[in-house]
A protein has these predicted regions:
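Short, glycine-anchored, charge-dense loop/turn motifs used at functional sites
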Residues: 11-17
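Zn2+-dependent cytidine deaminase-like catalytic core
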Residues: 18-138
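Single conserved hydrophobic/aromatic residue that forms the stacking wall/gate
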Residues: 1-9
Length: 138
């Protein structure tokens, strides 16, 4: 496990409607508990080949646990830490698969902690407009 991510989704009334974390599917062992990561062992660069990762991302875990009705117009808060050092990741962001899930869930903004007192605020409409999966469309 390379990174640990925790997040929550809050509705427009500022109530937490769901939380999530990176971890193996229910009933399966986590990489941190097993003491090994297949993607690290295969020397796969960070940010690539997520389909080979056994964990479910924090965003997906939170979205799975919430109703879409509650998520429409909501805010997702994300913080990432290095799995070994537990240091705050200053460049944390959602991967392209999680971005698609956030878009379809109806979440309006994503607030990512980038430092002790700093945050990156993302308007999800920007992810829609700047489609990182449309590299093949002219």
């Amino acid at each position: 496990l390379r990174r640990q991510r925790q997040m929550c989704i809050r509705d427009s009334n500022d109530e937490i409607i769901s939380t999530g974390y990176n971890g193996a599917p229910r009933g399966r062992i986590n990489c941190t508990d097993a003491g090994r990561c297949a993607r690290v062992e295969m020397k796969i660069p960070s940010g690539e080949r997520y389909e080979l990762c056994r964990s479910v991302h924090a965003e997906a875990n939170a979205i799975i646990s919430a109703s879409r009705r509650d998520m429409i117009g909501s805010t997702l808060y994300l913080v990432g830490r290095d799995a070994q050092t537990h240091e705050l990741l200053t460049n944390a962001t959602s991967c392209s698969m999680c971005r698609r899930q956030v878009i379809n869930a109806g979440i309006e903004r994503v607030i990512i902690r980038t430092g002790d007192d700093t945050f990156n605020i993302v308007d999800v409409d920007e992810w829609v407009k700047n489609d990182d999966s449309a590299f093949w469309i002219e």
